[in-house]
């Protein structure tokens, strides 16, 4: 068994404005046994200075890696190779998640022996004032194919590591 229940991989490029809010939402998750893998994809802004503060404050939880720019897919692939969790989650560095998200996903995955657990999401305006529920993912049973492949989003799911470690994201995308 791995040390962590969930490894969360965050590719980082040009997000110094958002990365603190993202990391705050992850270090404060109600699921304690998580590993946060931050992959700096060669960003030139001050994101790494912010990341370093979190690594120092949460050394058992936040891990930072710096690599040459290869795009979001390349950074996710790199992060997956570092992951030690039983499940893998992905968060975009300009996003944040609700504090119970990974606990709920993990508990559902374990209780139902799932390879993938999926949750809904909100679309939030730049000023954080307008939250709109994205209904596309709310009823998985009604729309399984679209939930898995329609949006091609990875940030509202956890995947059993044994499933995704055999796959790779395309590099040089975004």
Each PLM stretch: what is its role?
Residues 1-28:
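N-proximal low-complexity "stem/linker" segments adjacent to membrane-targeting elements
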Residues 20, 45-54, 96, 100:
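Acidic helix N-cap motif at the loop->helix transition within catalytic regions
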Residues 25, 40-49, 71:
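A conserved acidic beta->alpha catalytic loop
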Residues 33-43, 63-68, 93:
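Short beta-strand/loop segment that forms part of the nucleotide-sugar
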Residues 67-83:
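Glycine-rich, basic loop-to-helix element that forms the pyrophosphate-binding segment
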Residues 88:
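Short aromatic/hydrophobic "clamp" motif used to bind/position activated sugar donors
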Residues 100-131:
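Conserved donor NDP-sugar-binding/catalytic core segment of glycosyltransferases
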Residues 143-174:
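Conserved nucleotide-sugar donor-binding catalytic segment
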């Amino acid at each position: 068994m791995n040390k962590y229940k969930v490894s969360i991989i965050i590719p980082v490029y040009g997000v110094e404005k958002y990365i603190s809010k993202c990391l705050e939402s992850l270090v404060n998750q109600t699921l304690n046994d998580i590993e946060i893998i931050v992959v700096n994809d060669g960003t030139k802004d001050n994101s790494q200075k912010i990341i370093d503060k979190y690594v120092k404050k949460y050394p058992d939880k936040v891990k930072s890696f710096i690599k040459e720019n290869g795009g979001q897919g390349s950074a996710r692939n790199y992060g997956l190779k570092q992951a030690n969790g039983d499940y893998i989650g992905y968060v975009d560095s300009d996003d944040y998640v609700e504090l119970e998200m990974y606990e709920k996903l993990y508990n559902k995955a374990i209780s139902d022996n799932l390879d993938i657990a999926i949750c809904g999401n909100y679309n939030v305006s730049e000023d954080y004032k307008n939250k709109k529920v994205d209904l596309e993912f709310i009823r998985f049973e009604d729309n399984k194919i679209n939930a898995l492949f329609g949006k091609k989003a990875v940030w509202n799911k956890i995947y059993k590591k044994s499933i995704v470690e055999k796959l790779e994201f395309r590099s040089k995308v975004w």
